[in-house]
Amino acid sequence: MINQMTQNENTQNQFSNAVKELQIGKLLRTANITKSCGVSAYEVFQFLLLLVFQGKNLFRFLNSKRKDQAVSKNTYYRFLNDTSFNWTRFLLLLSAKVTSMFSSLTRPERVKVLVLDDSVVKRSRSKAVELLARVYDHVEHKYQKGFTMLTLGWSDGYSFVPVGFNLLSSAKKSNRYQEISDKIDHRTNGYKIRKESMLSKPEAAVLLVKRALAAGIQADYVLMDTWFTTEPMLAKLLEAGLDTIGMVKQLNQRYSYQGRAYTLPQLRKFVRFDSSKNIFGSIIVTTKTGIPVKIVIVRNHNKKSECLYLLSTDCSLSDAEIVRIYGNRWSIECFFKASKSFLKLGTEFQSRTYDAMVSHTTIVFTRYTILEWIRRRENDQKTYGELFFMFCEDIQDMDLTNALQSLMALFVEQFSALSADITACIKSKVTEWMNSQAAFIQALFENICWES
């Protein structure tokens, strides 16, 4: 059961206060996310930000009894589809502000990392979506219709903050079902992100890292899985000034040791194994182009006949420290799960334009960042699932509160018209019932006036 909130907590105000504290309105203006007339871009953005906690999509909300709290559907979709908005810059500005605050809460020597990974955003039933492509899903081991969401995040071991993303289509034209719309002005931010969506995955990954560093986001290492841990990638990240820790596959790549080239399994014979531990040992070698790396051999609990190999370009780290730091990579997997399960990543809007998908993804990333901000500021040990449902329940409880108070007021009004004997009997029963309820229900009826 999710923990009950105290009587004075107001989730909407709490979320809105975080938005104000982070100066979201200023960040939107800096990223050219503005409107020339009508309701402000800040109000539209804040509505879309909180929409997921209402338990309804945009269509259902605009057809509900609370539709007076919203503006027209066209206003929201024009906002999502605008090609002039620089969502990439907005997310970088927000993440830089949040990571700076988180860094101030920890000691300077604490390791901070950038985590790189991808996840497929499916559009299985779509046909006319802009830049829709045939992409490979490494989880289900088959091709899907949709996009590869390449994501870069920041972590200090306690918090995870999404820094940037690229909704990759496909670098191969033969794998793309749709191309860039002819109506897009080539001078806009929208056209630029469309061109970036057709970059190869390694090129897009390096671009994300360089942008994060240019925005002032500080990190000591980049963590990657087996797909990204390649020699060209290591070289590019070293040029950018960052060391890498990643897992490597047992392929045909060779590493130089004592003047000879060996594969990963062949290097095992040079390591003194300690079978009683999970970390068997390590060895320092060089890659084909001369990059010195440290390879740590770790027990594979899923398949005891094989080992796992962790590679670090920082050879000064101990074996245990390399394994510990690499464990922070799990935070991005939790982020993907939370974003898709709770924050409706990829399912909240089914628009056909690439701009709408980018703006929606940025809104989801912003939701996650603000939830993390609230959790960190309050030193809250809740999981993201608990925090999400706490927000939803509080909004629903406010509606229930109003309903109960209105019902009781109507009851008291009709009650006053009855005879004195019946009134005394009913008043006694109602008072007895109220006293048997929980304290938060009793508090709703403290100010009831029984006199006509």
Regions found by a protein language model. Give the residues of each.
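Short, positively charged, Gly/Tyr-enriched micro-motifs
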Residues: 27-100, 108-109, 155-161, 198, ...
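Acidic, His- and aromatic-enriched active-site or binding-groove loops in soluble protein domains
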Residues: 242-253
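A short acidic (Asp/Glu
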Residues: 125-127, 230-237, 253-260
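Electropositive, glycine- and tryptophan-enriched low-complexity nucleic-acid-binding patches
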Residues: 57, 74-81, 139-218, 295-309
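Short amphipathic alpha-helical "interface-anchor" segments enriched in bulky aromatics
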Residues: 110, 114-120, 319-350
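Active-site-proximal, Lys/Arg-enriched surface segment
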Residues: 81-172
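A short, flexible helix-boundary coil/loop motif
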Residues: 1-39, 51, 67, 167-171, ...
